[in-house]
Amino acid sequence: MKVSVLITLAVLGVMFLLTSAEERGSDQMDSPAWLKSMEIIFQSEERECRWLFGGCEKDSDCCEHLGCRRAKPSWCGWDFTVGK
């Protein structure tokens, strides 16, 4: 969710830069340098575990209280445990 919000804000920022550059009549936009500095937003977020229904290969890929279901495709499902 956090990543999708950041990507949406980045896309809106790029659209704003492009429209403002067109309004100024500028042939040289400085947006490519700005986009390179924002590259980290577009990289996938590394997680320490997979959430419910996330893809997995083994139980340790899934978050706490989840286990890897071996049905094809493999996914993380609740392992019927509770607690903190």
Swiss-Prot record:
Annotated compartments: Secreted
Propeptide: 22-47
Short name of any one Pfam family annotated for the protein: Toxin_12
Record's GO cellular component terms: extracellular region
Signal sequence coordinates: 1-21
Top-level division of the source organism's lineage: Eukaryota
PTM annotation (Valine amide): residues: V82
Disulfide bonds: C49-C63, C56-C68, C62-C76
Tissue expression: Expressed by the venom gland.
UniProt keyword annotations, A-Z: Amidation, Disulfide bond, Ion channel impairing toxin, Knottin, Secreted, Signal, Toxin
Gene Ontology molecular function: ion channel inhibitor activity; toxin activity
Family annotation (InterPro entries): Huwentoxin-1 (IPR011696)
Family of the protein in this entry: Belongs to the neurotoxin 10 (Hwtx-1) family. 05 (F4a) subfamily.
Function: Probable ion channel inhibitor.
Protein name: U21-theraphotoxin-Cg1a 1
Phylogenetic lineage: Eukaryota, Metazoa, Ecdysozoa, Arthropoda, Chelicerata
